């Protein structure tokens, strides 16, 4: 019962070119291998802060979701302007999960919303390193270790939200110095302790 969560290739999220359709086809073919074996839990489309809420980006995202239709999709927005009811409604209509993200509280970043747009919850913990978020590199930005109190709070939140979902997926992205592994083990322990 081992499941995989894939992250969409950066050619579909961070470095979108005119040939993105070909990239989507290649990615879809690769993902189909896991999907066909019922080992694909989700495909994360993580969109960067600069992917702002514009008409062009809305059309692109709709086209990308259509290109990956049939897969269990999760969208993670890093820009607060995507957090509005019309976006939630469209994701729900297409059965696309809106990722719940834990991140530093900084201007421009989305709120930690617990809006469910599908029967799946995808909770991604990036750490709360506010001093490195905008100026750090891919390692220092996520260099953060959650405290036991923070993880207990997350476990309680997951318990509450899991009552509304068929599947709950949790991913730690605070990967510097293996903090993600340590925090994931701790969270698992709290979930068991609280009998969630």
Model-assigned labels for residue ranges:
Residues 1-196:
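Residues lining hydrophobic/aromatic ligand-binding pockets adjacent to catalytic sites
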């Amino acid at each position: 019962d081992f499941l995989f969560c894939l992250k969409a290739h950066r050619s579909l999220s961070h470095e979108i070119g005119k040939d993105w359709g070909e990239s989507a086809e290649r990615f879809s073919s690769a993902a189909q291998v896991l999907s066909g074996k019922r080992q694909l839990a989700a495909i994360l489309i993580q969109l960067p802060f600069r992917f702002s809420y514009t008409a062009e980006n809305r059309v692109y995202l709709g086209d990308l979701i259509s290109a990956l239709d049939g897969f269990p999709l999760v969208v993670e927005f890093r820009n607060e302007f995507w957090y509005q009811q019309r976006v939630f409604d469209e994701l729900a209509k297409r059965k696309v999960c809106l990722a719940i993200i834990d991140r530093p509280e900084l201007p421009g970043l989305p709120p930690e919303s617990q809006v469910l747009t599908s029967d799946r919850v995808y909770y991604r913990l990036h750490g709360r390193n506010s001093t490195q978020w905008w100026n750090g590199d891919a390692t220092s930005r996520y260099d953060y270790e959650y405290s036991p109190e923070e993880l207990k709070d997350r476990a309680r939140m997951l318990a509450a939200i899991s009552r509304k979902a068929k599947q709950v997926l949790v991913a730690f992205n605070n990967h510097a110095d293996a903090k993600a592994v340590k925090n994931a083990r701790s969270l698992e322990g709290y979930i068991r302790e609280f009998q969630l």
